[in-house]
Amino acid sequence: MNYYWRWLQGIGFGILMASGATAIQAAEPLPRPLQPLRLSQSYTDLVAVSLFQHYTAGYPAPILTDGLSSREIDSVHLTFVRRLIGEAGDDGSVVGYKVALTNPNAQAQLGVNHPLYGFLLENMLLESGASLPMEFGSRPHAEGDLMVRVGSADINQADTDLELLAALDAVIPFLELPDLIYEPDANVNAGALVAVNVGARYGIVGDPVDLAVDESGLEQLANIRVVLNNARGQFLAEGSSDALLGHPINAVRWLRDTLNSQGVELRPGDLLSLGSVTSLVSLEEGAGIQGIEARYFGLESSERSVDLEVSFEEPEQDS
């Protein structure tokens, strides 16, 4: 157990999950673990606090991370997430991870050649039928996502795709409601995205669907289609699960390998959001979207879709 892990334990990243007490190391979503900062800690704290204030106030933030090293970005990220946990109180347990930038074109736009990850907190995950304020974030969006659940710690030693699959116990429809946070004209790069926990805000979680632990399970994961419609049934976006690094199991492998390289092991019960299946749908002012229905085809053997819904409440007008 390295020094970095002991430091993280000291800042309170112990988490409690339904399956039992679990400790997770928070670390930078890049290939190597980083040591904690000392000389620039106060400055990175100021950046994290400012970004957190924009996040909680729902007001778009400027880019504050230009010129920061990867180590400094890591410190901003951890401080930002620590404040999210504190703000959430009893509902602030870390329950899993969110993978971002699973599309090579999106990676290139942000200047990297790999995905990124952030943390999912319990209070971010909502049931289908939930209602949120229309302005639930600084720059609210929606996208069809896909989630899997870790069923066995064997995932950390799994070699083949089938071994990875066998360590998962469910695939879960997940309508993510991310927050882009930064000002519309901001030049967002990978560091800026990592600093704000890769934009995690809310998501609508469906019921877990069992996965077959053979080739049919891999085929099932590879052939999921997601369609987003607005509350009036009008088409918004669609996509298929091969958008996730070519196959969802590749996104699982990338996250597992990245975490393991940083001394972190996945635990049974961890929820893994694997990335964008559809394109982003803007929910910002003027979009006129009062609700979204996400229809998942191919999750189950029947042709019937698995559907998720969320509605958005208009702000009260001053009289």
Model-derived segments and their meaning:
Residues 266-279:
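Conserved metal-binding segment of the jelly-roll/cupin
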Residues 9-20:
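Bacterial N-terminal signal peptides
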Residues 23-27:
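Boundary at the C-terminal end of the N-terminal hydrophobic targeting segment
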Residues 144, 285-319:
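Charged, cofactor-coupling segments
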Residues 73, 262-264:
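Short, surface-exposed secondary-structure edge patches
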